[in-house]
Amino acid sequence: MPEINEIRNYALFISDKLKNKEIIDIKILNGRYKHKGPFEHYETLKKDLPIKLLDVKTKGKLLYMILEDNYYILSTLGLSGGWCYLKAGKKEEKDNFDFSKNMDYYQGHVADDKMDSYIKNSINHLNVEFKTSKGSLFYYDTLSFGTIKVIKGIDELNKKLKTLGPDIMDIGTDLVVFKTQIKKPKNLEKEIGIVLMDQKTISGIGNYLRSDILYLSKINPFRKVNKLSDAEIKIIFDNCKLLTWGEFDKKEAKRLKILNKNSKLPEDYDRLFFVYNQDTDIHGNKVIKKELYEGSQKRFIYYVKEIQAY
């Protein structure tokens, strides 16, 4: 379930390992692309190897690698996808793999046995390898809900990026932009808990962020957008920025005046989340779990009735 702050950490991780290095081979090892056929333009890209990785960027929950010769690799992580790295000559053993900053954060809040199981399971599902002379970057995905796609040409990239709403962490996504997107006519009769997850409206917010954002905002997730005041929308916006930037880069969040001495994050209460997948909140109130989603993929919202009155 990686969300925008984690996607940005993966982008930094991949950039650190592969930027300005040549990819000399790509192998499909496991997962959906092994069993159902390779991702689009896989064979074409392989024929053009070696090829240098120039940069790694993100928009919302989409990560994309910029290569030479106008190639782009697009990555979505689904529920269980991620990236890890193994130096050349090292055996594929748990302690030899490098993981992103995300793993450090999880290890501080998840039991050791669960983390150990997660890492082992990830290594057992290395689905795609991008090899350089210095080592290999692996895409892992235990459930194979994530995707990899190769496209060619800046026009194709821009076409994809235009399908996504403004990135919630982007500096240009200010309150005016946020409010305009949230209050589009198509959203007015929808629950705010659904609208926040619509990647065409605002990109980057997923299931756990929406629960915690609305909890901090003291807004019931089933409230319709047309029933929210401008003041309430501002509170939601502020907490979107706080939870995404606060988890990603505290120093930068302080510089941007998103995080201040009064700001609180889940880690301040020794928790991974405020209410997502929790039995009680930080005050001991019962957390309610209910279905709230659009489309075919079932999603649950977590909220506290005493704090988030309808």
Placement of each model-derived feature along the sequence:
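Phosphate/anion-contacting hairpin/loop surfaces
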Residues: 73-205, 209-216
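Generic recognition of long tandem-repeat/solenoid scaffolds
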Residues: 63-67, 128-130, 302-304
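Basic, nucleic-acid-binding surfaces and adjacent catalytic neighborhoods in DNA/RNA-processing proteins
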Residues: 12, 22-44, 57, 177-310
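A residue-level signal for conserved active-site and pocket-lining positions in enzyme catalytic cores
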Residues: 7, 61, 75, 128-130, ...
